[in-house]
């Protein structure tokens, strides 16, 4: 097994007290956000549940700023996501009934990768992002915590994996400090998310 399971994702979020408005973990058939007036978050897999899933991404809705945040740890663009996973951000947005006659939804997505393709840590990065969202809301990306991560050009073979590996070290330190569940299960979680788990670069 590699990566986080749905149960582990929820338990990590719970340990960080980040479950207010959390709709759950979903596969590629996520129905979308439907409540315009409440904070909502979700962690979605780009693959079908019955096939074990492929890659986690995170979604968050801030009704105050009317912004939907999409976070992909690998930073893929829509065409790349479709090419690699047969998954579309556009379809995801369309399924969310958040627009109104007098307000347009502003979609904000990261354009850089923060995770190395050699690691199985997409679930951990998604939990970290939702922590940033709950703490900073409309500044989910533009805050000192998230900006502690190095950004890189999205690529199957990262041009500078060293910086992305530093992000992983930062992530483990963050969870070790903030999450009792992580501390209690550190060896198991690290073994399933560690750098070098997937052969993607030398």
UniProtKB/Swiss-Prot annotation:
Site, Cleavage: residue positions: 52-53
Superkingdom of origin: Viruses
Residue numbers annotated as active site: 55, 72, 122
Regulation: Requires DNA and protease cofactor for maximal activation. Inside nascent virions, becomes partially activated by binding to the viral DNA, allowing it to cleave the cofactor that binds to the protease and fully activates it. Actin, like the viral protease cofactor, seems to act as a cofactor in the cleavage of cytokeratin 18 and of actin itself.
Subcellular compartments: Virion; Host nucleus
Chief location of this protein within or outside the cell: virion
Any one Gene Ontology cellular component term annotated for this protein: virion component
Keywords, sorted A to Z: Autocatalytic cleavage, Disulfide bond, DNA-binding, Host nucleus, Hydrolase, Late protein, Protease, Thiol protease, Virion
Enzyme Commission number, as recorded: 3.4.22.39
Pfam families named among the record's database cross-references: Peptidase_C5
Extra information: All late proteins expressed from the major late promoter are produced by alternative splicing and alternative polyadenylation of the same gene giving rise to non-overlapping ORFs. A leader sequence is present in the N-terminus of all these mRNAs and is recognized by the viral shutoff protein to provide expression although conventional translation via ribosome scanning from the cap has been shut off in the host cell.
Described purpose of this protein according to its UniProt entry: Cleaves viral precursor proteins (pTP, pIIIa, pVI, pVII, pVIII, and pX) inside newly assembled particles giving rise to mature virions. Protease complexed to its cofactor slides along the viral DNA to specifically locate and cleave the viral precursors. Mature virions have a weakened organization compared to the unmature virions, thereby facilitating subsequent uncoating. Without maturation, the particle lacks infectivity and is unable to uncoat. Late in adenovirus infection, in the cytoplasm, may participate in the cytoskeleton destruction. Cleaves host cell cytoskeletal keratins K7 and K18.
Record text on subunit structure and interactions: Interacts with protease cofactor pVI-C; this interaction is necessary for protease activation.
Family per similarity comment: Belongs to the peptidase C5 family.
HAMAP family: ADV_PRO
Name used for this protein in its record: Protease
């Amino acid at each position: 097994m590699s990566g986080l399971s749905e149960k582990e994702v929820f338990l990590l979020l719970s340990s960080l007290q980040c479950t207010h408005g959390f709709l759950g973990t979903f596969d590629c058939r996520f129905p979308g956000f439907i409540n315009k007036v409440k904070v909502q978050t979700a962690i979605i897999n780009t693959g079908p549940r019955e096939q074990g899933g492929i890659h986690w991404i995170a979604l968050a809705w801030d009704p105050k700023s009317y912004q939907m945040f999409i976070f992909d740890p690998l930073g893929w663009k829509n065409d790349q996501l479709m090419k690699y996973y047969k998954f579309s951000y556009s379809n995801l947005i369309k399924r969310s009934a958040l627009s109104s006659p007098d307000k347009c939804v502003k979609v904000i997505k990261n354009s850089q990768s923060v995770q190395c393709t050699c690691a199985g840590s997409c679930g951990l990065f998604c939990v970290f992002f939702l922590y940033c969202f709950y703490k900073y809301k409309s500044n989910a990306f533009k805050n000192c915590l998230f900006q502690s991560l190095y950004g890189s050009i999205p690529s199957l073979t990262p041009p500078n994996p060293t910086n992305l590996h530093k992000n992983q070290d930062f992530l483990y330190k963050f969870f070790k400090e903030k999450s009792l569940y992580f501390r209690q299960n550190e060896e198991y979680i690290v073994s399933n998310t560690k750098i070098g788990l997937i052969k993607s670069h030398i």
